[in-house]
Amino acid sequence: MNIPYISRYKINLSSAVVSCAAFVCMSAYPVFSQPAKGANKFLGNITVMSSIRSDYLKYWNQITGENESKWESVERTRDKMSWAGTDRIAKYSRENGIAWKFHCLVWGSQYPGWMNNLSQSEQLEEITEWLDSAAARYPDVQMIDVINEAYPSHKPPPFKNALGGDGSTGYDWMIKIFKMTRDRWPNAVLIYNDYNTIEWGSEVDWQVKMATAMKKNNSEMDAIGVQAHDAWKVATNTVKGNIDKLAATGYPIIVSEYDIGESNDSRQKQIMEEQFTMFWNHPKIVGVTYWGYIVGRTWRNGTGLLNDGGAERPALTWLVDFVKKNPNPPNDYPKLVKMPDDVSVAPHTTYTIISKKADVSGPMQIFNLQGRLSSSRLENSQPMSVVPVNSAHGCYIINYKDMQGGTIKSLR
């Protein structure tokens, strides 16, 4: 299976003319030296009570919404979608050139209660509408938790029979929802996400069995997300051994919701040193998302890393220093986390630049969000590159129609 790039620039081409949009960002946010900036693995976190703090970019180069994108949060009332929270996350990721993950599409916990009153055919219609709405609004999202916590004693969705149920493979409904997601997001990294799958034996074994079946049946699943909420309670060697078991299925691993529920600073730092070092140096792990970082504003006591006033707990100070000093850990799936500035299309292209306020024919030009043309020059080289000149801080859009192809390099 080809693993797609996590990229801000996603272009799907056919023989027909295709309209595309790419973003070039000169951030107006405070400029911080992110620990993982330029590293071959991402270091992420989540929103803080549906907001994004001004110090976010100081520590993290990947973002996940804690609750904003869950189906229940978006469509609490049938056919009334509330996207404001997810819009903020998508905008922030684009403006700052960091990857974001949509969390999550299907989960048997936080889904709209009105789904329980529908027939299976109606449930399938609503699932399809949910995916269609999200895909139309966020076609460029880099990663998606397609299914969350479907281990039998966790929270498999009660509407799974609308997707085919267990079926002949034992996982028919999962294969179907991944296929439906791939049809709408051809370039996103599609993830199965669950907890206890690197901690406790029976759940590790189930995850291995499930992943093996998904691989055998050519599912569209790209990666396994391991939440790792309880990993801090387990010996690091045991955790690593369980990760090795999952990795043997052939899927990349994302540590998706790690936290350390330890109020003692020294103990939290010790665990962080042991376990994060193992995560970062494991060749099958492509990135780590820590689940919350502000003391007193995380879902579990003791997991925070930064006091509200900005004082770092020792574990965070160590983490920042370690990642900065180790930007190129082993990674067997570097393309999964690469965020290139290249925008690739087919060779020998003529472009028409489209804006609300200007239409310009030519190789490419850059517009701000108000549709005003920004200065640029075209270098006479292959692949071509456009260099913004005298551009103020802000987010810029490159809109163009592909006629026959070419490769553009966008510099931010």
Question: Predicted regions span which residues?
Answer:
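Acidic-and-aromatic substrate-binding clefts and catalytic sites of carbohydrate-active enzymes
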Residues: 44-55, 71-84, 111, 151-155, ...
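Residue-level detector of functionally pivotal "anchor" positions at catalytic/ligand-binding pockets or at interdomain
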Residues: 33, 328-362, 368, 409
